[in-house]
Amino acid sequence: MAACVPPGEAPRSASGTPTRRQVTIVRIYLDGVYGIGKSTTGRVMASAASGGSPTLYFPEPMAYWRTLFETDVISGIYDTQNRKQQGNLAVDDAALITAHYQSRFTTPYLILHDHTCTLFGGNSLQRGTQPDLTLVFDRHPVASTVCFPAARYLLGDMSMCALMAMVATLPREPQGGNIVVTTLNVEEHIRRLRTRARIGEQIDITLIATLRNVYFMLVNTCHFLRSGRVWRDGWGELPTSCGAYKHRATQMDAFQERVSPELGDTLFALFKTQELLDDRGVILEVHAWALDALMLKLRNLNVFSADLSGTPRQCAAVVESLLPLMSSTLSDFDSASALERAARTFNAEMGV
């Protein structure tokens, strides 16, 4: 975490009463498949003060997952799949345990989002506005509530029921959110995973392939919504998601980012499954409401892609080059100071 909130005495009104000093904030969520290098990129951005403005970095909540409670979530979710594959755990039981672990991944992100979202400010500014403060979050809650659960569902590790339960917990994003989905060629991605050798983490090529596809779906979903379309546009013509769809979604780079995506390129397509439809093939209203909510929660996210194939400093520069295209919000000095305190606390408590 780099420099603190811009110093300075709060301005005063004509009567001499202190007024609330305004602070322009750009917030960035670095996201993508695990092991690409986003955490290193975020730390470098904070240490170098991206774009010349003070930068606060909120890391992955690793301690929350690994040491604060009785079970290591990262080791646990991989161990569950191993036990299932070895025949030591029934498929249905494994799915329930996987859903439990996945919900624990999301808890600290939801807590952090709830704590910080009221501090961002409500007024969205013109893109390209020079920020007084840059916030870099290591993942958005969409990762643990939508993307990773969707991948687990496509792999057969979680049920649609569990996926819907997770998706429903995604918080609505206030105006001004910017998510950067990080990418990397497969060979370098695997090399970096082997180099970091995180305890309990496994290099699961099929999971990696599925996550890559799901993140392309996320990018396409944000583009789709930004174009003014809704999930009902083309729903009737969309084929029902079936075993062939799931198989395709587990193949390396079967999905790609589309500038003008169709509904079938988005996350919404995987929800057109018999489990959510009535006997006529019509989606039940309660499930339609869930997709309406997902649409509204994602609508305020501006999505970008960034290739992290360079050095850490080069990767940070790639993300920083997107700053002029990003949305910002107008907050105040007290809120900015509260964000700085939150970042310091989160860094101190979440490190392992």
From Swiss-Prot:
EC assignment: 2.7.1.21
Gene Ontology MF terms in the entry: ATP binding; thymidine kinase activity
Binding site for substrate: 78, 102, 105, 148, 198
Pfam families per record: Herpes_TK
Catalytic reaction equation(s): thymidine + ATP = dTMP + ADP + H(+)
Origin superkingdom: Viruses
Record has Lyase as a keyword: no
Positions bound to ATP: 32-39, 192
SUPFAM superfamilies assigned to the protein according to its UniProt record, in alphabetical order: P-loop containing nucleoside triphosphate hydrolases
Active site annotation, chain numbering: 60
Keyword Transferase attributed: yes
InterPro entries in the record: Herpes_TK, P-loop_NTPase
Keywords assigned by UniProt, alphabetized: ATP-binding, DNA synthesis, Early protein, Kinase, Nucleotide-binding, Transferase
Subunit structure: Homodimer.
Homology family: Belongs to the herpesviridae thymidine kinase family.
Stated role: Catalyzes the transfer of the gamma-phospho group of ATP to thymidine to generate dTMP in the salvage pathway of pyrimidine synthesis. The dTMP serves as a substrate for DNA polymerase during viral DNA replication. Allows the virus to be reactivated and to grow in non-proliferative cells lacking a high concentration of phosphorylated nucleic acid precursors.
Protein name per Swiss-Prot or TrEMBL: Thymidine kinase
Native source species: Equine herpesvirus 4 (strain 1942)
